[in-house]
Structure formats: C-alpha cells, structure tokens
Regions:
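Cap/insert and terminal regions of metallo-dependent hydrolase folds
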Residues: 66-67, 76, 84-179
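Binuclear metal-dependent hydrolase catalytic cores
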Residues: 1-77, 156-189, 196-197
Length: 198
C-alpha cells in the first residue's frame, strides 16, 4: 500500500509543484498520508464499530486481496472485495445481515473461445459460485456489485440466474449507483436522489 501511494504522488509531482506556488498557494498538508498495512483480523475498533479484514481468493496470483466485515449493534455487513469462491469469505459471511458481493458473467461460448474472458471470470465470482456462497453463508440479504457482464448478458439475466440457482430462497438484488441500504430488522433498499438539491 505504501509503495502504491508513493507512486501515485510521484505520478502527480508536476501538478503538485504548480499548485503549491502562487497564485494557488496550496499547502502540502493535504498530501500527507499515514499508511497502515493490514492483515487478516481486527483492523478498526472504536465507538462500538468493529471492522475485520479477511483474505479472499482473487485468483491469478493476486496477493493481499481482502474482504471486510463490519459489525455494529448486533448488525453485520460483509463486503467481498474482488474475489471468486473463497471458503474464508463464506466463514466470515455466515448469517450476516448484508452481503455485498461482486459478480461477473459471460456466455459459455465466449468463455470457451477467449482465454482473456476465461481469465477475467477466473478473477471474479460467477453466478454459480455466487449461488454456492449464498447457500453456504446464508446471508439475510445479498447485493451484487462490481458488476462485470460480457457478451450481451444483462444484469436482469445474471440476477435471475443467481436467484434460480438458490431456488429463489434468498433475497438478492443488483446494486446500482446511489443505492441506499438500511440494515435493520428488515433490509430496505432505495434510490438516493440528489437531483433537486442545489
């Protein structure tokens, strides 16, 4: 993480030099960073909120891929991060209130003839893997996000496929921009609309 952040700063060094001189005269205070490398386990605990990081399998030799579990007032949310099927993710997701999980789909005909597409699917969670995760983890509600759909497959097709594979026994929705989610006794999703705000 430190190397990544340092490289981002290096990429923008010329812009930074311009912005700290007149007429803009910005300070470099906003560029200061405090990097904390994480590993599996508790990474934050304050004011009744606990955040756990856990390893997931992103495939293709990717190291240091993490999912996150957030616990607050007997409610729990898991964010999968980039992954395909991961037994560790299932362990951390058991009976959570909300599972926010990535999804990827492509027609078999394209996967079978394109090593690039097959490779992408190996880095991400297919509908079949998603159904397995849902069945094994039994989340109260699942929102599919970080959506990668290739070859003309629609979000509706992929959502229907996942629901069918879990026999429509679990609540699953596709995520979307400005989606709001209330994690209470009943999970409520809604669209945030800021179009009238000035």
């Amino acid at each position: 993480t430190k190397e990544f952040v340092d490289n981002i700063k290096s990429a923008f060094i010329e812009d930074i030099k311009i912005r700290i001189k007149p007429p803009e005269s910005h300070t470099e205070r906003g560029l200061r960073t405090k990097i904390t490398e994480i590993q599996e386990g508790v990474i934050y605990q304050e004011n009744g909120i606990t955040v756990l990081a856990f390893n997931v399998f992103h495939g293709g030799g990717v190291k240091h891929a993490f999912g996150y579990k957030i616990i607050y007032k007997n409610r729990s949310v898991v964010i999968s991060g980039d992954t395909n099927y991961s037994s560790n993710l299932v362990t951390y997701s058991k009976n959570v209130d909300l599972l926010i999980h990535e999804i990827a789909d492509a027609p078999d005909s394209i996967k079978n003839r394109s090593p690039k597409v097959k490779g992408l699917m190996d880095y991400h969670t297919t509908p079949e893997e998603m159904a397995r995760i849902i069945k094994e983890a039994s989340p109260k509600f699942t929102v599919l996000t970080h959506i990668l759909l290739l070859g003309g497959i629609s979000e509706a097709d992929t959502l229907d496929k996942v629901k069918s594979l879990v026999n429509n026994s679990y609540d699953v929705e596709m995520g979307y921009d400005l989606m709001g989610i209330d994690v209470k006794d009943e999970i409520i999703t809604y669209s945030l609309d800021y179009s009238d705000e000035k």
